[in-house]
């Protein structure tokens, strides 16, 4: 029992050693009995090798890990390849409307330039950090049809170990750490990686429902023009444009239109100088940095960016009137609160960084339901993903080093279409459309 309960990062072991661990197949009999080991018949014990060879023990084993494979569908997407620093990248022309195809009037543009997604890599996020050596099931499960098939000595669902954990990652990480870009290249040929089992949580033992946060394929990209140059796009107050400096200028213009102002008092030589807030006083912060969101799946809006005082701005004295009276003095917190309430949040694709994602479907394309087993990763399966449509600009990333818990913007016009297959290894196909179109 101790060996069977061993909980370990078998996916990392497989990635590091190019080998995977196997264990006895686990399944349920027709009478509802769990089979997790093989009984060795008496006749298999022989005192001669020749006799043992005539009476072998029949074992059924399965890989402890799953495999995920992803590619871009060159037949369905408009793609081009560019080379940067001896590295090939696949660029995909982005669409505006999911209902339309690859037609000139449906290509997405910003400031008159057609926008491409230059894919930098992919990884599996929200994945479990560990899985058990031997699969655990509830033989009494009455869940999706075909979850168990005794004649093939197989079952197609599982319980996570108690120490499974959950791993999230940034777009670009430090050396040796997990990151989206540090996963696998994403192009028009399949690349693959191993993944730990991530099916049912122990708290859902009786009904076998999947985890609230299933393993998810996440794809890193840069928004680029046709030559591969990143587009620093932003979306603010319903307007889409390019350049962080342009955004700050627009925000200052907005402040100039309202009655309430911000004034800084400083001494230059022997003169007391009073100036309205300027671009050098402002800096953009992620929602997490601005304490507007936390890195927890239950919280949304992590993709937003907020303008607040820069270091230079924090060093100044701020007032709400040009007279700079003691009564009108504002501390840093009050100034930032005023900026947030007056200007709101922006979406900034800093250096063009963006991401697309989708949960891995365990039942694949042929089972169209959102119930038990629809999402999940089970050992000894291959989840084969074919991305055949990319609509919209993805979820904006301002700080590529900040941990990402995937989410789609509320006004998103982005969509990803993909197809997943699982391989004996059991193969599950996922055809996926990445749809981030504005609703």
Describe every region a protein language model picked out.
Residues 392-393:
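Generic secondary-structure boundary signal with a strong preference for alpha-helix termini
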Residues 1, 67-71, 75-379, 434-438:
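Tryptophan-paired
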Residues 57-63, 208-210:
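Short, solvent-exposed beta-strand/turn "edge" segments of beta-rich domains on protein surfaces
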Residues 372-379, 384, 396-438:
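C-terminal functional modules
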Residues 2, 36-39, 44, 58, ...:
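Ser/Thr- (and often Asn-) enriched beta-sheet segments in non-cytosolic proteins
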Residues 2-55:
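Structured interaction patches on ligand/partner-binding surfaces of diverse proteins
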Residues 55-57, 76:
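Serine/threonine-rich, low-complexity linker/repeat segments that form flexible spacers/stalks
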